[in-house]
């Protein structure tokens, strides 16, 4: 089913009717607003409002200068007391460590009887030979005086009182120069004798080349030395015999 709405008339309504309608609408709105204000609010919604009002009404606690100063002093005293406690704890730990270290040393040390024997022996040696010690000290002092007076000597000998070995004082610059010169000389000799320009070969190669190039063919000379082992000497002799036998066969066939 289709519902048809009535068409509005195009004739304008009178002004009095328009004013009456506006007044009626405004009166209805005021009545609704008044009803809403008159309705009592629920308890759950009213409680937070009351709490907020109470919190706003409460004033901050008053703190006098004397009370603030007393609190600051108390905090300072607490900090100092904690620092003192830490220091005392550290001292106790150090004392314990020292005690343990001393105990460990005592365990590692020799027995008292052996220590007494060593001390008595050292004292007896010192009593017997005080003159020798004085003589040695005098000699060493004289040697030091001579070393100071001698300006021409470049190398000085330094001897300590409790050491027997002597040490030589040398400049490192001189050592470096000497080493560099020696290396340069070695390099020059090697380049002259065994460089790319030098025509150096072994004796066997030189003789073999001459024998090959000469019109009269000869055997490649292979010298025997006493430094070789017996096996090398035997091998050289066999090689020579074989070579001679081959040459003799070739001549007979010709």
Swiss-Prot record:
The keyword DNA-binding does not apply. GO terms for cellular component: chromosome; mitochondrion; nucleolus; small-subunit processome. It is found in: Nucleus, Nucleolus. InterPro entries: NOL7_C (IPR012579). Residues 18-31, 48-61 have a biased composition (Acidic residues). There is a cross-link at residues 127, 157 (Glycyl lysine isopeptide (Lys-Gly) (interchain with G-Cter in SUMO2)). The modification Phosphoserine is found at residue 129. Belongs to the UTP16 family. This is U3 small nucleolar RNA-associated protein NOL7. It comes from Mus musculus.
